[in-house]
Curated annotation (Swiss-Prot):
Disulfide bonds join 2-17, 9-22, 16-33, 24-31. One of its GO terms (molecular function) is calcium channel regulator activity. The lineage of its organism: Eukaryota, Metazoa, Ecdysozoa, Arthropoda, Chelicerata. Inhibits high-voltage activated calcium channels. Shifts the voltage-dependence for activation towards hyperpolarized membrane potentials for L- (Cav1), P/Q- (Cav2.1/CACNA1A) and R-type (Cav2.3/CACNA1E) calcium currents. Causes immediate agitation and clockwise gyration, followed by the gradual development of general flaccid paralysis when injected intracerebroventricular into mice at dose levels of 5 ug per mouse. It comes from Phoneutria reidyi. The keyword RNA-binding does not apply. This is Omega-ctenitoxin-Pr1a. The modification Glycine amide is found at residue 43. The presence of a 'disulfide through disulfide knot' structurally defines this protein as a knottin. Gene3D superfamilies: 4.10.40.10.
Amino acid sequence: ACAGLYKKCGKGVNTCCENRPCKCDLAMGNCICKKKFVEFFGG
């Protein structure tokens, strides 16, 4: 299983679907899957 867009991801949790980047909010400490760079351009 992989983590969908804006779902929790990280070490020991899930890797992001479609090789999306897992970005962590330093203040909150939670990591979620963000859009790939190309997706912002309708890729």
